[in-house]
Amino acid sequence: LKSGATIEADIIVTATGLNLVTLGEIEFKVDGNEVDFAQTWTYKGLAYSDVPNLVSTFGYINASWTLRADVVANYSCRLLNHMKKTGTQQATPRLRAQDQGMKARPWIDDFSAGYMQRMMHLMPRQGDHAPWLNPQLIAVDKQMIVKSPIDDGAMQFTKAKALV
């Protein structure tokens, strides 16, 4: 205290850290095959390569969490509106020819908190160019997510397969 007095503690709580998990540890399957998110690439920090119709929100690590949630929600609405307009049922981010040789980077760069480092091996990789980035910067996200076209060549739109 500023006065120099001390207050005895009744209890001291020590924490070893938060353990994050990927998407709530829900088992996702695509065409019967389990998805290993560590083998995917992050698409704009909100979707996963070769996983159709899935968008998730992970807020900013250095700004308001809800700020990014709003950006992702806006993108999701634009994506759904595009699908309705084009009559497509699946939106799947896929690596293009020019993306094949990308240098892999951690899902989130330059954040050393233990809770993040302990789970980084479970998360998708980040590339070295858009749209395969998770920049964690609102100015970059506004260009890459809010202002860029939905049909950017990496997001593939298809009609649902007929059930046999």
What feature does the model see in each segment?
Residues 53-164:
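C-terminal, flexible cofactor-proximal segment of oxidoreductases
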